[in-house]
Amino acid sequence: MRHDALFERVSARLKAQVGPDVFASWFGRLKLHSVSKSVVRLSVPTTFLKSWINNRYLDLITTLVQQEDSEILKVEILVRTATRGHRPTAPEESVAAAAEAAVVPPSRRSAAPTVAIAAAAVAAAPARPVQAPLFGSPLDQRYGFDSFVEGSSNRVALAAARTIAEAGAGAVRFNPLFIHSSVGLGKTHLLQAIALAALQSARAPRVVYLTAEYFMWRFATAIRDNDALSLKESLRNIDLLIIDDMQFLQGKSIQHEFCHLLNMLLDSAKQVVVAADRAPWELESLDSRVRSRLQGGVAIEMEGPDYEMRLEMLKRRLEAARQDDASLEIPLEILSHVARNVTASGRELEGAFNQLLFRRSFEPQLSIERVDELLGHLVNAGEPRRVRIEDIQRVVAKHYNVSRQELVSNRRTRVIVKPRQIAMYLSKTLTPRSFPEIGRRFGGRDHTTVLHAVRKIEELISADTKLSHEIELLKRLINE
């Protein structure tokens, strides 16, 4: 108990030292392993995180521990062994040392947050000419790391992306790296930034960036033209494969070819980066072998931008627009109002800014009231937010201190079963999804299991006031 208290005090001081965002992103899974004589041993889930903490924060942690207990002479970081199988998402702990922006102490950071959405401003000119990818979908030069706005919702994904783009031969990799989020939150921007930065590097790697739809078209064309072997050979020799919109990969034969390509690249230690609008285990249309291989890497979810991120995106967009019209002015009050009310995605924020830009050309004095009229179709006020099952799972998992993967796993312990049943109940009451579809989103369960969970929670709510209040709280959190 004394050692637990020591760890709690050190954790609190570490959080105060590095800031809550950095602490949550990188130290959230740090645990006390043991204390023996003069040595404190802390554990983390992955080798990546162990190496990163040892290189950057071990001295600070040791100092904090010794300030709490002068008898401690040494702090060691261990990698704890998993006690149960689960899908390897591990977003917080799966990013290596290149995540410089995420680990800079708050006092050395820019006052403005730097969050990531495709609507951001113009990227800085590259230090060297960017070569073209071998083939594939076109790259947009605006979508570099410099124009990607970073914040708490995408910091881990950005750090992983930078690590891959900057990694040299033999570097530690997250393979495959799987980035998932709803539409308009910056996945495509981030993937293109990886490709652009990698192509710009002195290593001159062989890079292929393409969408799943382009992959299907290219393979179908190659098969039709009896050129499939040539296409496979060209893909075999690449160093970095980046696939966007994986949820659109359809067709048994195409998926079979992609599975072979994926296996070949991963077995050859070539880097693969994939993005989709849902987690790999939720891509029900994919061949099970493809899903399994994608789940074998690191999956990182990007969430929606907060107010500070949205405001920064609008400021950058205004700065970019001023390059064409130096006299352009949109008051900060207007930008703040838009950032506060247009909350769905970066694409909608871009649409809102374009509306302002257009209207300002013949209505130079826009008021808040006029902005509300113009952007009424983009503002969520007064309209119920469309809730996704993924949102429900995330909020419920966080509330009950379990992982989202545990909710969809086969574990039947009490600490998992009750949150799982509550999440199923909320999925039925807050979304239009059917019992079978909800069951599939919860690890492929039968519709009768979902029906039982819904009825069970309904019974408990009627008899348990505390649970009823909990459910109402969860509904509010989900709809925020």
Curated annotation (Swiss-Prot):
Gene Ontology molecular function, alphabetical: ATP binding; ATP hydrolysis activity; DNA replication origin binding; lipid binding
Subcellular location(s) per record: Cytoplasm
GO annotation, biological process: DNA replication initiation; regulation of DNA replication
Residues the record lists as binding ATP: G184, G186, K187, T188
Ranges for region Domain I, interacts with DnaA modulators: 1-71
Chain positions covered by the region annotation Domain III, AAA+ region: 138-360
Region described as Domain II: 71-137
The organism's place on the tree of life at top rank: Bacteria
GO CC annotation: cytoplasm; plasma membrane
Keywords: ATP-binding, Cytoplasm, DNA replication, DNA-binding, Lipid-binding, Nucleotide-binding
Region (Domain IV, binds dsDNA): 361-480
Function field: Plays an essential role in the initiation and regulation of chromosomal replication. ATP-DnaA binds to the origin of replication (oriC) to initiate formation of the DNA replication initiation complex once per cell cycle. Binds the DnaA box (a 9 base pair repeat at the origin) and separates the double-stranded (ds)DNA. Forms a right-handed helical filament on oriC DNA; dsDNA binds to the exterior of the filament while single-stranded (ss)DNA is stabiized in the filament's interior.
Quaternary structure and partners: Oligomerizes as a right-handed, spiral filament on DNA at oriC.
Assigned protein family: Belongs to the DnaA family.
Domain note: Domain I is involved in oligomerization and binding regulators, domain II is flexibile and of varying length in different bacteria, domain III forms the AAA+ region, while domain IV binds dsDNA.
The name this protein goes by in its record: Chromosomal replication initiator protein DnaA
